[in-house]
Amino acid sequence: MGYRDALYNKTNYNSRGGDFRGGRSSDRNDYNRDRNQGYSHGGLRGRHDDGPRELIKPDWESELPNLPPFEKNFYVEHEVVRNRSDQEVAQFRKESEMTITGHDIPKPITTFDEAGFPDYVLKEVKAEGFDKPTSIQCQGWPMALSGRDMVGIAATGSGKTLSYCLPGIVHINAQPLLSPGDGPIVLVLAPTRELAVQIQKECSKFGKSSRIRNTCVYGGVPRGQQIRELIRGAEIVIATPGRLIDMLEAGKTNLKRVTYLVLDEADRMLDMGFEPQIRKIVDQIRPDRQTLMWSATWPKEVQQLARDYLNDPIQVQIGSLELAASHNITQLVEVVSEFEKRDRLVKHLDTASQDKESKILIFASTKRTCDEITSYLRQDGWPALAIHGDKDQRERDWVLNEFRTGNSPIMVATDVAARGIDVKGINFVVNYDMPGNIEDYVHRIGRTGRAGATGTAISFFTEDNKSLGASLISIMREAKQNIPEELMKYDRRPRGPHPRYGGGYGRGGRGYGGGRGGYGGRGGGRGGRGGFNRSRDGGWGNRR
């Protein structure tokens, strides 16, 4: 029996887009009764109208048996998938660099039709013109649709948002409708406002046929509009941990209806110090929920969080757990002094600007450096804007939109401001200042070379960065990049006859950007100063 058959049997037709929603009227009455009787789940120590109160963890041992049941297993294996041999499955996983952990793991799918999504979901997917599922989606969809707790480990830009968004829509459509005062059914926690907004766009796009409402809750802006949307009711809430805690403590929403929980970029949330807030939030959610954790890395802190809050999880990992950079990215490292950086930067901008569609993301270590670089570039006629923590939310939104649309194709950012930013078509990443650790280096350069595209990462390495030398060499070596001779003095590995990989920057190999005859490649050259760079009066054309 497929999804639609199963949903037909649940008797409750919902006018929302003509889909069949699960649940009996008695289920809704149960929820209403719980609320009217002072149901303590997601409760506060004090009345909602008394102002902020401390959240208290419900006594789940006594409360859980009295909660209304819910459905979370909707997966019906497609006949083609069912007939796929173990050898074929193993070969597919090997080719996809896929590692799985756990028991009773469903076989991967290879097409959208094999996933078994209802027609209303498939229609939205195909309307977007997607060719085929990504590797994480091939295994993640059957896992999520099966109702299992799961961990997905994959690089940023691998399609993980749809891996949990589409099953979440199916999950919502099988639950009782929201009643006045109910909180969300699906809760997505994300580390930054920018990522939360990006997730909301995907949820809106694919949930519109079901008329599923969503809202995004994040800090840095007035709370009024967010409060109104929460009170009006939304099946999906995407939130940053801090602002959600504020809303819960103020009694503006509750988590008693949450049965599908997503922790997106769990590693980044922990890096940013959100672990106490995450634990406080998750403690408010019924423990028999379905929980999906997504992460680009698998450090011990994330593993501990999974052990504490996931029940018998299954895990899929794309690629190696060892820290590695995408092989779609050409890494160019220049060993320079501090005062050489600006001239080197302009040289690379001259080259990159030959492509009018180029977008360049420049990382600086401090807000002051960020502003100084931007001011210097703008005085020289370059269309650059800065984004960092001292900018108010409205200005950050404007800068990001200018960068995304290409009106200002150069953006200078700090790490904190850039976290969660998902902009398509970034061709170049420049580490004007190297980050403090190798994990941030990999995360930074991963803003280019996404979704099968190629990109270039340029890094200025100074003597102050010597502590990163060995790990940087290791990352470049794994990706078969050309390592400059000046950097090799930091190598901890014994020098063999071929310590550096051939090709690449300045050696007549792949060349700048990976193409034959590119910058520094055979037959290459910088060319003129046309492209996207602006004149000082703000127009397009050659710089003066």
Curated annotation (Swiss-Prot):
Catalysed reaction per UniProt?
ATP + H2O = ADP + phosphate + H(+)
Q: Cellular location of this protein?
A: Cytoplasm; Nucleus
Q: Which SMART domains match?
A: DEXDc, HELICc
The Helicase ATP-binding domain, residue ranges:
141-316
Look at the named UniProt entry and state the broad enzyme category this protein falls under.
Answer: hydrolase
**Biological process according to GO:** nuclear polyadenylation-dependent mRNA catabolic process; nuclear-transcribed mRNA catabolic process, nonsense-mediated decay; rRNA processing; termination of RNA polymerase II transcription
Record's compositionally biased regions (Basic and acidic residues): 18-36
Disordered, as annotated region: 1-54, 490-544
Per the Swiss-Prot or TrEMBL annotation, the motif DEAD box is positioned at 264-267
This protein's UniProt keywords: ATP-binding, Cytoplasm, Helicase, Hydrolase, Nonsense-mediated mRNA decay, Nucleotide-binding, Nucleus, Ribosome biogenesis, RNA-binding, rRNA processing
The main place the protein resides is cytoplasm
Its domain description in UniProt is: The Q motif is unique to and characteristic of the DEAD box family of RNA helicases and controls ATP binding and hydrolysis.
UniProt xrefs under PANTHER family: ATP-DEPENDENT RNA HELICASE DBP3 (PTHR47958)
Q: What does this protein do?
A: ATP-dependent RNA helicase involved nonsense-mediated mRNA decay and ribosome biogenesis through rRNA processing.
The subunit structure is: Associates with polysomes.
Kindly provide the name given to this protein in its UniProt entry. Answer: ATP-dependent RNA helicase DBP2
Which organism does this record belong to? Candida glabrata (strain ATCC 2001 / BCRC 20586 / JCM 3761 / NBRC 0622 / NRRL Y-65 / CBS 138)
Q: Which gene encodes it?
A: DBP2
